[in-house]
């Protein structure tokens, strides 16, 4: 996936320029920005074969401990989330835009303090370091290499070249209507006095943000 394509999605997702460059640097260190790459030495399949097998349920993608994709997601719950989002979007688990969306989703859900930092910081080095240590958590914290990649993209992608995507990176809806209905029923069943009629099938983040807001307001 091209660096600028990733940069545009990350910026549209709220990351500052430094935050987006820091994430790009980490992705480059993890995967070389190859969206369908499977961890070297962990599978005998080619990247294309592994991706096709994952999409068709021919391998235990969630539990096989093979790092995969732009961020080399490895842990089973993270890979499961990736797979579920891919199915809901109707795209391959190797889709690059999907993976950028999922990284942003994880930041919002699981790393809110880091997300707030990445949306406001102008420090590329610190952004790169924190993503490595808090989000990626590799066996070896090669911080300098990740910083180097990030600054390389700083020279390659000028701020004047940034143009927000006109449309969402992925147009398919998530979650599907049955999932939205399940959220409504769960709220009602558990006695929450929330307005649930506002849910409708649409962008994953808009649905989940409404759900979280409803929970806070109950």
Which residues does each predicted region cover?
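Non-catalytic cell-wall polysaccharide-engagement segments
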Residues: 79-169, 173
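Solvent-exposed, acidic/flexible segments
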Residues: 3, 13-20, 63-66, 92-100, ...
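Acidic helix/loop microenvironments that form the catalytic cleft of cell-wall polysaccharide enzymes
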Residues: 27-31, 73-74, 118-141, 202-217
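Export/targeting segments at the very N-terminus of extracytoplasmic proteins
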Residues: 1-32
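Peptidoglycan-targeting cell-wall enzymes and recognition modules
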Residues: 5, 31-119
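Surface-exposed patches in mature extracellular/periplasmic domains of secreted proteins
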Residues: 14-24, 35-42, 113-123, 127, ...
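Solvent-exposed, polar/charged alpha-helical surfaces in well-ordered, non-transmembrane soluble domains
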Residues: 4, 8, 21-24, 101, ...
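Short acidic, glycine/serine/threonine-rich helix-capping segments at coil-helix boundaries
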Residues: 166-181, 185-218
């Amino acid at each position: 996936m091209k660096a600028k394509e990733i940069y545009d999605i990350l910026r549209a997702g709220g990351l500052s320029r430094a935050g987006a460059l820091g994430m790009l640097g980490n992705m480059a260190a993890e995967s070389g920005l190859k969206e369908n790459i499977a961890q070297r030495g962990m599978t005998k399949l080619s990247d294309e074969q592994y991706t096709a097998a994952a999409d068709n349920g021919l391998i235990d993608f969630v539990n096989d401990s093979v790092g995969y994709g732009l961020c080399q997601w490895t842990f089973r719950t993270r890979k499961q989330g990736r797979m579920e989002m891919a199915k809901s979007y109707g795209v391959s688990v190797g889709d690059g835009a999907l993976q950028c969306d999922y990284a942003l989703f994880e930041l919002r859900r699981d790393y809110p303090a880091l997300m707030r930092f990445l949306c406001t910081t102008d420090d590329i080095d610190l952004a790169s370091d924190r993503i490595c240590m808090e989000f990626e958590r590799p066996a070896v914290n090669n911080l300098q290499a990740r910083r180097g990649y990030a600054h390389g993209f700083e020279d390659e992608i000028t701020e004047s070249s940034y143009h927000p995507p006109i449309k969402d990176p992925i147009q398919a809806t998530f979650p599907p209507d049955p999932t939205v209905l399940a959220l409504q029923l769960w709220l009602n069943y558990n006695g929450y006095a929330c307005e649930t009629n506002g849910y409708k099938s649409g962008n994953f983040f808009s649905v989940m943000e409404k759900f979280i807001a409803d929970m806070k307001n109950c």
